[in-house]
């Protein structure tokens, strides 16, 4: 077994349509840190799904629903830390506003 500490999702702006931002391709992934920053001048929301292989993002795998970040607020999502994605599982996000929230996810990949 090999464990690699890595950036699962490089810093990027969350889309305002449901979007896959990471897939555990051939690995088991463990989320260690998930950070979101609202860089806009007004409040904005973000939702996060952890979806099993072959699944579709929806209410059954919604972990964080419409978390409101105030202008310039950063949030580190303790509710996501320690979650495991089996091979083929993925992280999907949905921002309520375009061009408002940046995300970055770090963790471990196990092969």
Regions from the language model: what does each represent?
Residues 44-55:
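The feature marks short-to-medium sequence segments in extracytoplasmic or secretory-pathway proteins
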Residues 4-6, 45-47, 66-68, 74:
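Ser/Thr- (and often Asn-) enriched beta-sheet segments in non-cytosolic proteins
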Residues 17-18, 40, 51, 61-63:
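Intrinsic disorder/low-complexity detector
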Residues 36-41, 96:
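Short solvent-exposed strand-capping/beta-turn motif centered on an Asx-Ser/Thr pair
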Residues 30-32, 44, 73, 87-89, ...:
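A generic structural signal for short beta-strands and their flanking turns/coil linkers
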Residues 53-90:
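Intrinsically disordered, low-complexity Pro/Gly/Ser/Thr-rich segments with frequent PxxP/GP/PP motifs
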Residues 1-29, 33, 54, 94-111:
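C-terminal interaction-tip segments
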């Amino acid at each position: 077994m090999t464990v690699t500490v890595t950036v699962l999702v490089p810093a990027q702006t969350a889309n305002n349509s449901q979007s896959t931002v990471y897939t555990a391709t051939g690995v088991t992934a463990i989320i260690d840190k998930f950070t979101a920053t609202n860089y806009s001048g007004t409040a904005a929301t973000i939702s996060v799904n952890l979806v099993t292989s072959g699944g579709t993002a929806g209410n059954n795998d919604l972990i964080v629903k419409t978390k409101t970040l105030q202008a310039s607020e950063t949030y580190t999502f303790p509710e996501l830390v320690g979650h495991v994605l089996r091979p083929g599982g993925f992280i999907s996000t949905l921002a309520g506003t375009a061009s408002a929230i940046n995300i970055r996810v770090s963790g471990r990949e196990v092969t």
